[in-house]
Amino acid sequence: MKALVKREAAKGIWLEEVPVPTPGPNEVLIKLEKTAICGTDLHIYLWDEWSQRTIKPGLTIGHEFVGRVAALGSAVTGYEIGQRVSAEGHIVCGHCRNCRGGRPHLCPNTVGIGVNVNGAFAEYMVMPASNLWPIPDQIPSELAAFFDPYGNAAHCALEFNVIGEDVLITGAGPIGIIAAGICKHIGARNVVVTDVNDFRLKLAADMGATRVVNVANQSLKDVMKELHMEGFDVGLEMSGNPRAFNDMLDCMYHGGKIAMLGIMPKGAGCDWDKIIFKGLTVQGIYGRKMYETWYKMTQLVLSGFPLGKVMTHQLPIDDFQKGFDLMEEGKAGKVVLSWN
């Protein structure tokens, strides 16, 4: 079968022939229909410092997907051949304190598909049946293909009550863009998104952000004055940029709450005085709650949330290089690849 493989310890990704995997007793074989390129895939493609210490060459990458059940392991029940599914890309142990306590998204033994084990950029893949998420007929496959990052955005946006609140989102990558839309969809008052990429800031505005701010040439505090704000009630940090995070701390209202998804560089500093004397709550966010986030994000789409606005490109798998080029240039929202 065809698969996108990190063949060499260098920049690039390679379309290769690899064996079709065989599902174990509790696994399902999935025939992939559509996959989407994540920022993680771009890191692996670029072969940056993180990927060099994390990824073993020879890995099939990818973790955003939708497909159909092609074969069932001998112990699998509850699914049918041909059923359309996506899946939670974090495979958890099931026996640690957090897994047994109903907090599997905090499993310390988590294994990520397309990072630690072979992933979804292939014609077929295997997944534990317990990780599958059935996709309702009303949801198009091109949207279901990126439910994984949509789930990151939903987990972050729903961590704190944003109804009637002023929300600051630092980072207009696809997850930040989707989070802006979710916050407006569920009733936030003002949603302000900051970045330095005008293309992606426009996508955030199209998704419903009240204001978008290119901080390279505009002051966030000036925008706050224009909106008659004293400070932000909720912050969603999506950029992994220390300067953006410190700007957020500076602009938070006393008692505000921050959900952090962006990964800061090691040793990055922050103004702890702002956190302490403003009484801020800072909550780390990783992945999706299993499977409450999946339920809520499915219902959001079924209730009219315009998730499709963040998708900018659909390409056949043979044009995968164009997709990675667009992502590297920052000239895309979500890029979806078709395996049909």
Swiss-Prot record:
GO cellular component terms given for this protein: cytoplasm
Main location, first listed in the record: cytoplasm
Disulphide linkage map: none
Binding site for NAD(+): I175, D195, R200, L261, G262, I263, I285, Y286
Molecular function as annotated in GO: L-threonine 3-dehydrogenase activity; zinc ion binding
Pathway terms, separated by semicolons: Amino-acid degradation; L-threonine degradation via oxydo-reductase pathway; glycine from L-threonine: step 1/2
Cellular compartment(s): Cytoplasm
PROSITE patterns, per database record: ADH_ZINC (PS00059)
Cofactor note (record): Binds 2 Zn(2+) ions per subunit.
UniProt-annotated catalytic positions: T40, H43
Swiss-Prot/TrEMBL cofactor(s): Zn(2+)
Catalytic activities: L-threonine + NAD(+) = (2S)-2-amino-3-oxobutanoate + NADH + H(+)
Subunit and partners: Homotetramer.
Protein task: Catalyzes the NAD(+)-dependent oxidation of L-threonine to 2-amino-3-ketobutyrate.
PANTHER family: L-THREONINE 3-DEHYDROGENASE
The protein's name in its UniProt record: L-threonine 3-dehydrogenase
